Structure formats: C-alpha cells, structure tokens
Amino acid sequence: MAAETASGYIQHHLQNLTYGQLPDGSWGFAHSAAEAKAMGFWAFHVDTLGWSLAMGLLFIWLFRMAAKRATTGVPGGLQNFVEVLVQFVDSSVKDTFHGRNPLIAPLALTIFAWVFLMNSIDLVPVDWIPQIAMAISGDEHLFFRAVPTTDPNATLAMSLSVFALIIIYSIKVKGLGGFLGELTLHPFSSKNIVLQIILIPVNFLLEFVTLIAKPFSLALRLFGNMYAGELVFILIAVMFGAGLLWLSGIAVVLQWAWALIHIFIITLQAFIFMMLTIVYLSMAHEDNH
C-alpha cells in the first residue's frame, strides 16, 4: 500500500475514490482527503456508486435467473433460497404492514437483498479489492472503498428515498389536510379553539422532529454499524502488517472470529433497515394518529 504507517494505512482505507472539480478548475480524481473535501457538494464517490450499482444488478440477475429456472418439480438450490427469502419477506410484511399496497412487499424484498449484498462486500479481505483497483488503474496511491454502506452518502440516499415514500403515501392516504393535521394537532389537543391554536407550534415542533428523525435514524444506524465493522477488519489487517509472528497469529484468530460475527451483523442490519421501512410505511397508511 502507498501508506506506510499504521495511521496512514487506516486513513487510506477510509477514503473514497472521489471525482470532482480540482483546485485548478479541472475535473478529476482527488489524490488526498483535503482535495476531496475541497471539491464540495458536487463530488462523486465513484466507488460507492459503482459497487452499489453492481450489487443492484447482481440482485436483479440472481432473481431473474431463479425465476427463469423455476420449476414445479424438485427445485434447485438457487430456487430454494429465493423461495425461502420471498416467503420470509412476505411474512414480515403481512405481520407488520396493515394497509393495502402491492408495492410494499417487492420494496421490502429489494431493500433486504440489496442492502445485504452491499454489506457482504465487507467480508472480502480489506486489501484485495483496493489492490485490484490499483493494479487496474496503475495508480498505487488510488483511494478505493468497496463497501457502499460504509459511506453515509449511500445510506442517507436510501433513507431519503424511503422518507419520500412516507410523505407521498401519508398525503395520498390521509389527504394534505390530514397529513398537516397530524403535524399540528397532535400530541397535544384541546377543545378550546384558542388553546388549540396556541398548541399548534408546539405540536408541529415535536411531530416535525419525530418525522425528520426517521430517515436520519435509518441512515446512521446502518452506516454506523457497517463503518465500525469495516474499521475492525482494518485494525486486524494492521496487526498482520506489524511483522510480529505472534501478533499475526492472534490476528488470524480475530479475523475469522470477527468474520463469523459480521455475517450475523450484515444480515441483521439489512433486516432492520427493511423492517423499519415497513413500519414507517405502515404508519403512513394509518388514517388515525
């Protein structure tokens, strides 16, 4: 790796491949964290975009292949897996979502599978994908992060998409008046009109904070858990690079132990993101507060 010290190695692994406008006015890839920061809002994390798109296409390809090979006879391994996953998601939706909307189950399945696939990249040894990217580009200083869900931009983008659906269905089901009523007439209400008017700003503040917290809690929960998991793998890799045989032996044990734990974590985080999405959309379909 281009970074020789432990701190440099860690920082290198935590920096995205960023494309944007350089200080001289030209457009290109950032070669330092300072350059990436200077690019401002219109900077693109190419690695995050590429891998999230790749995992989305992988999800579509796997499920399309399973659908094409589906048979009424003895199902194959992929068909069995897809059927179990679909039944699991369908059962979760039926138990949690109390409205009627044909979009919810496919959306929940897409979220779970896509987030799981993006999370699962974290199980690949931390140096493999960056080293391949460096070899292909010919740039030994290339920044490259392969796990999209360790980038808050990716998790926030997904959660904001869910948030948009919450707003759309809240207005569609309850009407604009009903939606605004939820924000201004609850949780405090009074039969006295003057007092109710006085309570409107208080209600709006409380309900607006609750509403706006939903996408941020979704995004930060997924990002925080995956970022921490990635950091643990990087720290274990630093132990390998220390050059001490006994430390490398401990690192081997820790790597396998953490990988086994992390399989549970990446699955759990995909499940939580899916379930919270279902819960929030179910609340958006409820007529009463």
UniProtKB/Swiss-Prot annotation:
<keyword id="KW-0375">Hydrogen ion transport</keyword>
<feature type="transmembrane region" description="Helical">
    <location>
        <begin position="193"/>
        <end position="213"/>
    </location>
</feature>
<comment type="subunit">
    <text>F-type ATPases have 2 components, CF(1) - the catalytic core - and CF(0) - the membrane proton channel. CF(1) has five subunits: alpha(3), beta(3), gamma(1), delta(1), epsilon(1). CF(0) has three main subunits: a(1), b(2) and c(9-12). The alpha and beta chains form an alternating ring which encloses part of the gamma chain. CF(1) is attached to CF(0) by a central stalk formed by the gamma and epsilon chains, while a peripheral stalk is formed by the delta and b chains.</text>
</comment>
<keyword id="KW-0138">CF(0)</keyword>
<dbReference type="GO" id="GO:0045259">
    <property type="term" value="C:proton-transporting ATP synthase complex"/>
</dbReference>
<keyword id="KW-0066">ATP synthesis</keyword>
<keyword id="KW-0472">Membrane</keyword>
<dbReference type="InterPro" id="IPR000568">
    <property type="entry name" value="ATP_synth_F0_asu"/>
</dbReference>
<comment type="similarity">
    <text>Belongs to the ATPase A chain family.</text>
</comment>
<dbReference type="InterPro" id="IPR035908">
    <property type="entry name" value="F0_ATP_A_sf"/>
</dbReference>
<feature type="transmembrane region" description="Helical">
    <location>
        <begin position="104"/>
        <end position="124"/>
    </location>
</feature>
<keyword id="KW-1003">Cell membrane</keyword>
<keyword id="KW-0997">Cell inner membrane</keyword>
<dbReference type="InterPro" id="IPR023011">
    <property type="entry name" value="ATP_synth_F0_asu_AS"/>
</dbReference>
<dbReference type="GO" id="GO:0042777">
    <property type="term" value="P:proton motive force-driven plasma membrane ATP synthesis"/>
</dbReference>
<keyword id="KW-1133">Transmembrane helix</keyword>
<feature type="transmembrane region" description="Helical">
    <location>
        <begin position="43"/>
        <end position="63"/>
    </location>
</feature>
<feature type="transmembrane region" description="Helical">
    <location>
        <begin position="232"/>
        <end position="252"/>
    </location>
</feature>
<dbReference type="Pfam" id="PF00119">
    <property type="entry name" value="ATP-synt_A"/>
</dbReference>
<dbReference type="GO" id="GO:0005886">
    <property type="term" value="C:plasma membrane"/>
</dbReference>
<keyword id="KW-0812">Transmembrane</keyword>
<feature type="transmembrane region" description="Helical">
    <location>
        <begin position="160"/>
        <end position="180"/>
    </location>
</feature>
<protein>
    <recommendedName>
        <fullName>ATP synthase subunit a</fullName>
    </recommendedName>
</protein>
<feature type="transmembrane region" description="Helical">
    <location>
        <begin position="259"/>
        <end position="279"/>
    </location>
</feature>
<keyword id="KW-0406">Ion transport</keyword>
<dbReference type="GO" id="GO:0046933">
    <property type="term" value="F:proton-transporting ATP synthase activity, rotational mechanism"/>
</dbReference>
<dbReference type="InterPro" id="IPR045082">
    <property type="entry name" value="ATP_syn_F0_a_bact/chloroplast"/>
</dbReference>
<comment type="function">
    <text>Key component of the proton channel; it plays a direct role in the translocation of protons across the membrane.</text>
</comment>
<keyword id="KW-0813">Transport</keyword>
